[in-house]
Amino acid sequence: MYALNLFDLADNDLYHRYSRRSVGAVGKHGGRVVALGRLERTVKGDPAVDPRTAMVLVERPSPQAFDAFLEDPEHEDLHPLREDGTRNYLWWTYDRMEDLRRLFGGPEPGS
């Protein structure tokens, strides 16, 4: 599964502190950062919605691994750094697909 994080940085150093520790916390539960990015431009979008300036895409082995990351008591002080170090945070999870057939109601690859 993938977790897509879109956000703006708050005017403090909390997300910087979060980022120094988060790689280990994510890795502990089998996750890995697939991509990091800063907004380059808006190609098409809803004019009523401001784009977020930062993007982090994390791959995780399962929804259970994601929940274990969120609920790990060893890192309970970590999540407030992310929450208070950002603004306008959007966070979604997506299941992994080999191609788009499942979206269209078709058979899975290899079935």
Q: Language model features by range: what are they?
A:
Residues 1-73, 94-111:
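Short S/T/G/P-rich N-terminal loop/turn motif that feeds into the first structured element of a domain
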Residues 79-84:
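C-terminal structural segments of small proteins and small subunits
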